[in-house]
Amino acid sequence: MSQIYFTQDHEWLSVEGQVVTVGITNYAQEQLGDLVFVDLPQSGTKLSKGDAAAVVESVKAASDVYAPLDGEVVEINEALANSPELVNQKAEKEGWLWKMTVQDETQLEGLLDEAAYKTLIG
């Protein structure tokens, strides 16, 4: 079973073993409005925590999505190239952005659990 974490930048992470699936939260997609474009990192890209890894563009604004951990991108959500609205429809499921390996599991300790994230967004 996967463990779910959140960041203060409104990203969610689903951790299964050494692979982490990353996306933006439902709250974030609601704030952005209808997405029209998603620019994802390439598979094989090495990311450091805090790097701008992707861009989600909506009718309102373009926003960076940051790497929540150090690691390497192992898969991207190809469906978003033609259907960025998946992020609006199912942000925390089929609207995931990329999957990456975890290099340093201690970085998970600084992330929020669901209760802490709900407190953050009020």
Curated annotation (Swiss-Prot):
UniProt-listed GO biological process terms: glycine decarboxylation via glycine cleavage system
Question: A GO CC term?
Answer: cytosol
Co-factor binding details: Binds 1 lipoyl cofactor covalently.
Mention any Pfam family matching this sequence: GCV_H
Could you tell me which residues carry N6-lipoyllysine? 60
Could you tell me which residue ranges the Lipoyl-binding domain spans? Answer: 19-101
- UniProt xrefs under InterPro entries: 2-oxoA_DH_lipoyl-BS, Biotin_lipoyl, GCV_H, GCV_H/Fam206, GCV_H_sub, Single_hybrid_motif
What cofactors are annotated for this protein? (R)-lipoate
Q: Which domain of life is it from?
A: Bacteria
Q: What does this protein do?
A: The glycine cleavage system catalyzes the degradation of glycine. The H protein shuttles the methylamine group of glycine from the P protein to the T protein.
- Subunit notes for this chain? The glycine cleavage system is composed of four proteins: P, T, L and H.
- Would you identify the family this protein belongs to, as annotated? Belongs to the GcvH family.
PANTHER family of this UniProt entry?
A: GLYCINE CLEAVAGE SYSTEM H PROTEIN, GLYCINE CLEAVAGE SYSTEM H PROTEIN-RELATED
The name this protein goes by in its record: Glycine cleavage system H protein
Q: Which organism is it from?
A: Bartonella quintana (strain Toulouse) (Rochalimaea quintana)
